[in-house]
Curated annotation (Swiss-Prot):
It comes from the Bacteria. It comes from Rhizobium johnstonii (strain DSM 114642 / LMG 32736 / 3841) (Rhizobium leguminosarum bv. viciae). This is tRNA (guanine-N(7)-)-methyltransferase. PANTHER family: 3-DEOXY-D-MANNO-OCTULOSONIC-ACID TRANSFERASE/TRNA GUANINE-N 7 - -METHYLTRANSFERASE, PENTACOTRIPEPTIDE-REPEAT REGION OF PRORP DOMAIN-CONTAINING PROTEIN. Belongs to the class I-like SAM-binding methyltransferase superfamily. TrmB family. Catalyzes the formation of N(7)-methylguanine at position 46 (m7G46) in tRNA. The gene is trmB. The keyword tRNA processing applies. Its EC number is 2.1.1.33. Keywords: Methyltransferase, S-adenosyl-L-methionine, Transferase, tRNA processing. The active site is at 138. GO terms for cellular component: tRNA methyltransferase complex.
Length: 233
């Protein structure tokens, strides 16, 4: 990456902290031993076909941006072993949790990236992905910080480029302003069609959806969630 690209990326601050509590010795060992085997190296060109990132045969490719505790990602990977999953998470503690679960379950259809998701998106070839999941992203609730929200014209352009024709962008949130923001951004972009006929289509969790800690927290605090699905057109 050039110095100019680094300066440009400095303005794309979509995430906050990189670390939480200090990892215990065993947790640090898990992270250090497993991360190299699952980490995508962006200094190398994307392999052809991209499915060869995985040591097992996969038919579809799915990206989850900001996987948090990894509950959803590991659930989907075990549920659909014929899909290759790429998870992006810059938060060290969350990455350790996912890698620990990978070690426990033996899931081999997952690869990860531990920095800014826009770097990975720009590395991916055109039309590479079947689906992108952005689930309970940081809402940046203060209006002055809304420009930091991951859903933006620039990132929707990225999504549109890397999705296959008819590929899906799935967005879940319990923050009404972010749900409305995403609907407006996707409508104005013009490259995405919202798949919804009635309220049940966005108030009902996705098929096979595992409850996550973020969703549980929202319910405890009296907030309902929206589950939006957009198709690339």
């Amino acid at each position: 990456m050039t110095d100019m690209e680094r300066r440009g990326r400095a303005t794309e601050a979509f995430f906050g902290r990189r670390k939480g509590k200090a990892l215990r010795e065993q947790q640090a060992e898990t992270l250090n031993s497993l991360l190299p085997a699952f980490l995508i190296d962006l200094s190398a060109a994307p392999p052809e076909p991209l499915t060869s990132l995985f040591p097992v045969p996969v038919e579809r490719l799915r990206l989850e941006i900001g996987f948090g505790g990894g509950e959803h990602l590991i659930h989907r990977a075990l549920e659909t072993p014929s899909t290759g999953f790429i998870g992006v998470e810059p938060f060290v503690n969350s990455m350790q949790k996912l890698l620990s679960r990978i070690g426990e379950t033996g899931a081999s259809n997952i690869r990860v990236y531990n920095d800014d998701a826009t770097q990975l998106l720009d590395w991916l070839p055109d039309g590479a992905l079947d689906q992108i999941d952005l689930l309970y992203p940081d809402p940046w609730p203060k209006r002055k910080h809304w420009k930091r929200r991951f859903v933006s014209k620039t990132n929707l352009d990225r999504f549109h480029r890397v999705l296959k024709p008819g590929g899906l962008f799935c967005f879940a949130s319990d923050i009404d302003t972010y749900v409305n923001w995403t609907l407006i951004k996707c409508r104005d972009h013009g490259g995405f069609e919202w798949i919804a006929d009635n309220a049940a289509d966005w108030l009902t969790p996705y098929e096979g959806w595992p409850s996550t800690r973020y969703e549980a927290k929202a319910r405890r605090e009296g907030r309902s969630s929206a589950y939006l699905t957009f198709r690339k057109v």
